[in-house]
Swiss-Prot record:
Similarity comment: Belongs to the GatB/GatE family. GatB subfamily.
Key word Transcription present: no
Catalysed reaction equations from the record: L-glutamyl-tRNA(Gln) + L-glutamine + ATP + H2O = L-glutaminyl-tRNA(Gln) + L-glutamate + ADP + phosphate + H(+); L-aspartyl-tRNA(Asn) + L-glutamine + ATP + H2O = L-asparaginyl-tRNA(Asn) + L-glutamate + ADP + phosphate + 2 H(+)
Quaternary state and interactors: Heterotrimer of A, B and C subunits.
Molecular function GO terms recorded: asparaginyl-tRNA synthase (glutamine-hydrolyzing) activity; ATP binding; glutaminyl-tRNA synthase (glutamine-hydrolyzing) activity
InterPro entries, sorted: Asn/Gln-tRNA_amidoTrfase_suB/E, Asn/Gln-tRNA_Trfase_suB/E_cat, Asn/Gln_amidotransferase, Asn/Gln_tRNA_amidoTrase-B-like, GatB, GatB_C_1, GatB_Yqey_C_2, Gln-tRNA_amidoTrfase_suB_CS
Protein role: Allows the formation of correctly charged Asn-tRNA(Asn) or Gln-tRNA(Gln) through the transamidation of misacylated Asp-tRNA(Asn) or Glu-tRNA(Gln) in organisms which lack either or both of asparaginyl-tRNA or glutaminyl-tRNA synthetases. The reaction takes place in the presence of glutamine and ATP through an activated phospho-Asp-tRNA(Asn) or phospho-Glu-tRNA(Gln).
Protein name: Aspartyl/glutamyl-tRNA(Asn/Gln) amidotransferase subunit B
Entry keyword set: ATP-binding, Ligase, Nucleotide-binding, Protein biosynthesis
Amino acid sequence: MEWEPVIGLEVHVQLRTQSKIFSGAATAYGAEPNTQACAIDLGLPGVLPVLNKEAVKLAVCFGLSVNASIPPYSIFARKNYFYPDLPKGYQISQYNFPIVQNGHLDIENEDGTTKRIGITRAHLEEDAGKSFHEGMQGYSGIDFNRAGTPLLEIVSEPDIRSAQEAVAYLKALHSLVRYIGVSDANMQEGAFRCDVNISLRPKGEEKFGTRAEIKNVNSFRFVERAILFEINRQKEILENGGTIVQETRLYDAVQDETRSMRTKEEAHDYRYFPDPDLLPVEIGPEFIEAVKNQLPELPWEKRKRFAASYQLSNYDVKLLTTQIEIANYFETVLKIDKTIPPKLAANWINGDLAAALNKNNLSITQSPINAEQLASLLHRIADNTLSGSMGKQVFETMWGGEGDADTIIERHGLKQITDTEALEKIIDEVIENNPTQVEQYRSGKDKLIAFFVGQVMKATKGKANPQQVNELFKKKL
């Protein structure tokens, strides 16, 4: 029997606010344990939560970017459960009346086709604390710094049918929240976490199977591997006549497997009820319009503009716009020097610069070569001061911190030889020293032109303009 996976994702995005969702405590990452938790975060008696308006604004911003509806009011509810890192014994979340409803996000599959993934809802909630075990000598500690940090939980429709589609959706969502500035979505810091709901059904059937939930997967690669394992696990059970248990599972990256954590809870297990300490949130059309007017250019809008304005291929555009920082770097280079061809800038950013960054595990914002320096290099390639190979030499030297292109060219004597008289002298010597190859070329072996050009490049230590040399050879021969 052929089985069809049915996958829905719940993504927890930490919102980019200076303070927590219901208190004035800071949200900065990496502080000493329990130095950023106030009485409200700890749920001490007599304290009352106050909603952070910026969190509401960021949630609305996200909703508008995915063409969702923003209801005129939403309600906070208490989600009741016990866990050591939940000091109040309940989590303030949203249940029946979320702040964002019925949106969608288009993803591009590996074959270039586009698929629309529905977004059921996105709701605001507070994060819990975090357990830690190192250095506790048989005990577990609790760090409440994260407690009360604002989260936007984004729930997709069960429209995803493969691990590859799940990763494509997550990458599109990750890019979007960073583009619009609602989150830095740093996965290493837990600012972008994913729960995967997955079931199997016979292909062609509409009824869903029993689902399992895989909690807190924090990398694209692990999401893909967890889904692939879970599909195979459920398939094996069903084909052997067994039944799937509705449960919460954990992905073990070391063993590359999912393991059962607990039986999956239903909504009634959490005993949701409206939080009596928080009034309903009323969101008027004026507020929505104000947020809409501040929306930045969205990823798909930027891709369309790059393709039209810069005449770039879909491949180049996709690489340049995956991260907002790369797109900004590219446009900064072109603004600094309008004589640089966009294709030249794209080739260097997507090629040599990307390779160097990957090799050194750096992001574009950590690049030793800033946009001004790269522009200085590309200017000298565009005006034929440097050949492509010499440009790579300058790039490597620039990466080492020796300054801009002109400084490096002057210091290392890397200026390209374009003087026709000087080049013709070297060409004459090459022709004189290689009579056999000259005869073969004149007999119809046109590919030998590359040999002649190579000899000149060798003689000039790469400083000759290869195109100019090619043309001069053809005239001579």
